[in-house]
């Protein structure tokens, strides 16, 4: 379950962060929004073999040679994404072992698909939640799982490692992950 150096190596073609289209997270895992997920040229040029649509809003265009998986979850605090963490992480890993490439997407590529990505990195690359978030944010700066997904990711990290590297804290805007505390203070002081 540990990450090999080649999984994250820039020599494997990992590109600079992309905000609007595809963001390459590992050699075989990409994040995007719903529009990019239906762009045949982007899919082909990135050799995508499987697409996980973590939304109810986006309708995929089905292209030959690509496996499609639907995760019908809304981007709401009370949505149960946790139930999909293991099955989707296992799927991404299986596709990687077969030399395939997976695209995770939701509507914006910010919350649902990012949460599934973090779960995968924890499970199959033995990354803490904090490290998985830091890495993924370096590849796709716009990620920001909703607070309900954060709570589920924190529970998942504890299930995997019997430890937590991120915790929910009280703030003037309600409970937030502690990694956002500094950003919130800066916004409030403006």
UniProtKB/Swiss-Prot annotation:
<keyword id="KW-0378">Hydrolase</keyword>
<keyword id="KW-0472">Membrane</keyword>
<keyword id="KW-0999">Mitochondrion inner membrane</keyword>
<dbReference type="InterPro" id="IPR020420">
    <property type="entry name" value="Atypical_DUSP_subfamB"/>
</dbReference>
<dbReference type="Pfam" id="PF00782">
    <property type="entry name" value="DSPc"/>
</dbReference>
<keyword id="KW-0496">Mitochondrion</keyword>
<dbReference type="GO" id="GO:0017017">
    <property type="term" value="F:MAP kinase tyrosine/serine/threonine phosphatase activity"/>
</dbReference>
<dbReference type="GO" id="GO:0005737">
    <property type="term" value="C:cytoplasm"/>
</dbReference>
<keyword id="KW-0966">Cell projection</keyword>
<dbReference type="GO" id="GO:0005743">
    <property type="term" value="C:mitochondrial inner membrane"/>
</dbReference>
<dbReference type="InterPro" id="IPR016130">
    <property type="entry name" value="Tyr_Pase_AS"/>
</dbReference>
<keyword id="KW-0282">Flagellum</keyword>
<keyword id="KW-0969">Cilium</keyword>
<feature type="region of interest" description="Sufficient for mitochondrial localization">
    <location>
        <begin position="43"/>
        <end position="128"/>
    </location>
</feature>
<feature type="domain" description="Tyrosine-protein phosphatase">
    <location>
        <begin position="21"/>
        <end position="162"/>
    </location>
</feature>
<keyword id="KW-0904">Protein phosphatase</keyword>
<dbReference type="GO" id="GO:0036126">
    <property type="term" value="C:sperm flagellum"/>
</dbReference>
<feature type="active site" description="Phosphocysteine intermediate">
    <location>
        <position position="106"/>
    </location>
</feature>
<dbReference type="InterPro" id="IPR020422">
    <property type="entry name" value="TYR_PHOSPHATASE_DUAL_dom"/>
</dbReference>
<dbReference type="GO" id="GO:0005759">
    <property type="term" value="C:mitochondrial matrix"/>
</dbReference>
<dbReference type="GO" id="GO:0004725">
    <property type="term" value="F:protein tyrosine phosphatase activity"/>
</dbReference>
<keyword id="KW-0963">Cytoplasm</keyword>
<keyword id="KW-0539">Nucleus</keyword>
<dbReference type="InterPro" id="IPR000387">
    <property type="entry name" value="Tyr_Pase_dom"/>
</dbReference>
<dbReference type="GO" id="GO:0160111">
    <property type="term" value="C:axonemal A tubule inner sheath"/>
</dbReference>
<comment type="similarity">
    <text>Belongs to the protein-tyrosine phosphatase family. Non-receptor class dual specificity subfamily.</text>
</comment>
<comment type="subunit">
    <text>Microtubule inner protein component of sperm flagellar doublet microtubules.</text>
</comment>
<dbReference type="InterPro" id="IPR000340">
    <property type="entry name" value="Dual-sp_phosphatase_cat-dom"/>
</dbReference>
<comment type="function">
    <text>Protein phosphatase component of the sperm flagellar doublet microtubules. May act as a regulator of sperm motility by mediating dephosphorylation of sperm doublet microtubule proteins. Can dephosphorylate single and diphosphorylated synthetic MAPK peptides, with preference for the phosphotyrosine and diphosphorylated forms over phosphothreonine.</text>
</comment>
<protein>
    <recommendedName>
        <fullName>Dual specificity protein phosphatase 21</fullName>
        <ecNumber>3.1.3.16</ecNumber>
        <ecNumber>3.1.3.48</ecNumber>
    </recommendedName>
</protein>
<dbReference type="InterPro" id="IPR029021">
    <property type="entry name" value="Prot-tyrosine_phosphatase-like"/>
</dbReference>
<dbReference type="GO" id="GO:0035335">
    <property type="term" value="P:peptidyl-tyrosine dephosphorylation"/>
</dbReference>
<dbReference type="GO" id="GO:0004722">
    <property type="term" value="F:protein serine/threonine phosphatase activity"/>
</dbReference>
<dbReference type="GO" id="GO:0005634">
    <property type="term" value="C:nucleus"/>
</dbReference>
<keyword id="KW-0206">Cytoskeleton</keyword>
<dbReference type="GO" id="GO:0030317">
    <property type="term" value="P:flagellated sperm motility"/>
</dbReference>
């Amino acid at each position: 379950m540990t990450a090999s150096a080649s999984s994250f190596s820039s020599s494997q073609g990992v590109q600079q962060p992309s905000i609007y289209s595809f963001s390459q997270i590992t050699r075989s895992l990409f994040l995007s929004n719903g529009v990019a997920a239906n762009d045949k040229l982007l899919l082909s040029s990135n050799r995508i073999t499987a697409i996980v649509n973590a939304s109810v809003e986006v309708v995929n265009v089905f292209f030959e040679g690509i496996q499609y998986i639907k995760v019908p979850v809304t981007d709401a605090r009370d949505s149960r994404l946790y139930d999909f963490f293991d099955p989707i992480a296992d799927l991404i890993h299986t596709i990687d072992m077969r030399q395939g490439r997976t695209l995770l997407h939701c509507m914006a590529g910010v919350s649902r698909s990012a949460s599934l990505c973090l779960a995968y990195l924890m499970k199959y690359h033995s990354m803490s939640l904090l490290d998985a978030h830091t890495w993924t944010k370096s590849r796709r700066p716009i990620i920001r799982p909703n607070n309900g997904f954060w709570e589920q990711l924190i529970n998942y990290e504890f299930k995997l490692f019997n430890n937590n590297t991120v915790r929910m804290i009280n703030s003037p805007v309600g409970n937030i992950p502690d990694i956002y505390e500094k950003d919130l203070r800066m916004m409030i002081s403006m």
